[in-house]
């Protein structure tokens, strides 16, 4: 039985990955977003739940932690954002992950975050004493999503996935936007850009937030671009369809945009077998 502590747990994709791999676990999560917790509780009733990571101390645990997982908020680090880095309160939470790793001394650890300025990357690497591995979700799903993974879990080679699209996806993705005038040029792309927590507000085809209208896939019937449905976003994240049902679509998009990509985490966790 593996004792797992997941910080900034979100919708518990790490738990889903462990369970799908058949790795028996006692899973403890720390999360404060009520909508993410709602999704997690619906899918994983056996999780032991804590609250704010800033209130957690090593003495809270009777048993050693075998695996420490974290995907600390990345908005301040993101190259697409304001790039406040560690000065951003959300990104500064990575220091809580580092603190608990030092206090708990887990056998294995995994920290995920977005691509960031070199100085921020160096700080995390020096604190964890390991260099990150960059993995794009495009090797596992139909989404281009680059993320950095700091871990001491041995990671095997990645074989690019092959996609078979059904009638709903037959022409792949056709990003296009409208403002108040006619539609802009529609282009074909084999993969969708990075799904973000702000997708419900609309995003650009390259994954950056879009503040006017939305891009998504091309609707053959209505003959214009539409947003992806929450179910399609679940597919892009490698999750079972309906995993995030039970909350509003806005919160589903947000929770999915903040989540791990399941097949990527499964690939990493295969090193625990």
Positions of the model-derived regions?
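Acidic-aromatic/histidine active-site loop/patch
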Residues: 265
């Amino acid at each position: 039985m593996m004792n797992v502590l997941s910080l900034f747990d979100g919708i518990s994709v790490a738990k889903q990955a462990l369970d799908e791999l058949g790795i028996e676990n006692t899973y403890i999560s720390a999360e404060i977003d009520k909508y993410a917790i709602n999704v997690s509780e619906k899918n994983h009733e056996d999780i032991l739940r804590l609250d704010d990571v800033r209130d957690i101390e090593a003495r809270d645990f009777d048993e050693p932690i075998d695996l420490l997982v974290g995907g600390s908020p990345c908005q301040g680090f993101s190259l697409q954002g304001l790039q406040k880095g560690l000065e951003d309160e959300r990104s500064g939470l990575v220091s809580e992950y580092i603190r608990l790793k030092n206090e708990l001394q887990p056998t294995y650890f995994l920290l995920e975050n977005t691509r960031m300025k070199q100085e921020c990357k160096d700080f995390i690497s020096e604190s964890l004493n390991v260099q990150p591995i960059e993995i794009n979700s495009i090797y596992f799903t139909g989404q281009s999503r680059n993320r950095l993974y700091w871990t001491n879990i041995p990671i095997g080679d990645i074989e690019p996935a092959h996609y078979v699209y059904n009638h709903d996806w037959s022409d792949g993705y056709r990003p296009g936007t409208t403002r108040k005038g006619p539609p802009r040029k529609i282009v074909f792309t084999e993969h969708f850009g990075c799904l973000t927590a702000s997708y419900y507000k609309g995003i650009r085809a390259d994954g950056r937030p879009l503040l006017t209208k939305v891009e998504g896939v091309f609707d053959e019937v209505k003959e214009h671009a539409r947003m992806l449905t929450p179910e399609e976003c679940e597919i892009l994240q490698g999750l079972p369809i309906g995993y995030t049902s039970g909350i509003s679509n806005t919160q589903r998009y947000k929770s999915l945009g903040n989540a791990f990509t399941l097949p990527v985490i499964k690939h990493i966790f295969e090193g625990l077998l």
